[in-house]
Every structure is written in structure tokens, then in C-alpha cells.
Regions:
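Conserved alpha-helical scaffold segments that buttress catalytic/binding sites
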Residues: 2-266
Length: 266
């Protein structure tokens, strides 16, 4: 099964790097004019994603993007969605844990747990505080839960496109992102005898860590860095779009009305 996971901030020329804790809308003066026009948005939805008002897809509009994850859990519980499933993530941010501590927490003894036990873990401790699944790491949690079988990141061309945790890549390797789609692989790993390597660790240390690590199945991770290379036929089982109010100006809210024309809200 395949789900479309949209974020409203993809339809902007200027990308905000707002701290997760900030809840205010973006300033109209700086961000308002960067929002795509209605015609451009409709063209992308219909010509790039293959959506149609004549064959609407069940879905939901949410506020914070981590609510997409809870929507999927709801669908799984109701038997409407089966896992693992493919995710097409159209966003200005990868939401794979960069800027969070979750990649270290998830690449831990948790990987030794049965899947049923993993899925009961909803938070972790970092610097004396309890952190929960958030807007910046919910996809990484989905991978750790083995909910996601394949992930395609349709990245905003104006963003960095490699805003994920390097240490979650298979063999600590990533293909360079330029102007064409790139295929990487995410593979969570844990070696109880060694600390997780950092980017500048020696290759010998990285190889030793990998040799003694337990490893989750690899997940194909495709990054599409341009709008022109986004090509889908609309064959999605479900659609979810996040408003992401702290990453969009209020003037962008008309996008939600447009999306509603292409989905059957559930």
C-alpha cells in the first residue's frame, strides 16, 4: 500500500527553519509572497502527483506533521491500512530526526526488541527531559516500528534536501544529491559494545561498529530534489496533508481548501 504525505510548506519558495518549540505563524512580510499560486498548486497536484477531483482519495488534513503518524496508526487499527507501507513524503523537511535526539535513542537496545514491544515505546529521555514523537522525527519512528517499507522524499528544491541523520544510512554511506533523483538506504543499527560513530570517525572504527552491529532491514530511501522529477499516477491508498502552522504563513491556508477538493476526508 502507498500513502501520500504532504506538507503545506512544500508550496513555498522560501523555507523556514523554525525551532520545533515555536508555535507562531510565519511573518507575512517575509514569507507571504513565497507561497505558490493556486494554479501552480493545482498543476502540481494533478500533473505531478496524478490527483484528480473526479477520483478523490480518502485522507485527512492535520495540523502538526507528526499527526500523520497517528492517522496511519488509526488506519492500521481499523484494518484500512496494512503495514509495512510505502510513503511518498512531499515536504520542505525530511522529518527523519535531524535536530532531534531520537536517532540515537532508536538506534539502541530497542532494536533487540520484538516489533510488538517496540511499538509500545512512545518516548525517550534526553538531557533529563522526556521527548516524544514530534514533527521532526515521526518518519524515523515509523521506520523503527517497521511500519514503512519504502520512503520517497520529494524535497523542496529550495531546501538542503539532505536534512536527515547521516548515521541512519546503511553502512554510513550516502549518495551525493545534485539535480537528479538519488537512491539511498536507511538501516537502523546497534552495537552494544561501541558508541555510535560520528561523521568524522575513522573508517576502521565505522567498519568495526558495523561488523558487530545488529541491523534492521534496509529501507529504500529515494530523494527527488526537483519538481520536474516528481511523477506519480495518483495511485495512493490514502492522503494526508499537514498545515504545519509554524512553518507557513496564515495566507497559505487556502491550500487546505484546495486539497479538500482532491480527498474524501475521513
Amino acid at each position: 500500500m502507498k500513502v501520500l504525505d504532504l506538507d503545506m510548506d512544500y508550496f513555498m519558495e522560501v523555507i523556514a527553519e523554525t525551532p520545533f518549540s515555536v508555535t507562531d505563524r510565519l511573518e507575512e512580510e517575509y514569507y507571504g509572497e513565497s507561497v505558490w499560486s493556486e494554479n501552480r498548486i493545482r498543476s502540481f497536484l494533478e500533473n505531478n502527483l496524478g490527483l484528480s477531483k473526479d477520483r478523490r482519495i480518502e485522507g485527512r488534513i492535520v495540523c502538526g506533521h507528526n499527526e500523520a503518524w497517528f492517522f496511519w496508526e488509526e488506519l492500521l487499527a481499523d484494518g484500512k491500512l496494512s503495514d509495512p507501507f510505502e510513503v511518498v513524503h512531499v515536504d520542505s523537511h525530511a522529518d527523519l530526526g535531524l535536530g532531534c535526539a531520537s536517532s540515537d535513542s532508536l538506534q539502541s537496545a530497542m532494536l533487540t526488541f520484538p516489533i510488538e514491544s517496540r511499538r509500545k515505546i512512545r518516548d525517550y529521555e534526553f538531557n533529563g527531559k522526556i521527548e516524544q514523537i514530534n514533527i521532526g522525527d515521526y518518519l524515523l519512528w515509523g521506520i523503527a516500528y517497521r511500519m514503512i517499507s519504502k520512503l520517497t522524499y520529494c524535497a523542496n528544491p529550495n531546501g538542503s534536501k539532505n536534512d536527515y541523520c547521516w548515521d541512519t544510512m546503511k553502512d554510513f554511506h550516502e549518495e551525493w544529491i545534485s539535480n537528479h533523483p538519488v537512491t539511498n538506504y536507511i538501516q537502523l543499527k546497534y552495537n552494544c559494545e561501541m558508541d555510535l560513530p560520528c561523521y568524522d570517525s575513522e573508517e576502521a572504527y565505522k567498519n568495526k561498529y558495523l561488523a558487530g552491529a545488529i541491523k534492521d532491514p534496509e529501507i529504500e530511501f529515494i530523494i527527488i530534489p526537483t519538481i520536474e522529477d516528481v511523477h506519480y499516477d495518483g495511485e495512493f491508498n490514502f492522503v494526508v496533508m499537514a498545515q504545519s502552522p509554524n512553518y507557513t504563513p496564515a495566507s497559505a491556508d487556502f491550500i487546505m481548501d484546495i486539497i479538500m477538493e482532491y480527498i474524501i476526508e475521513i
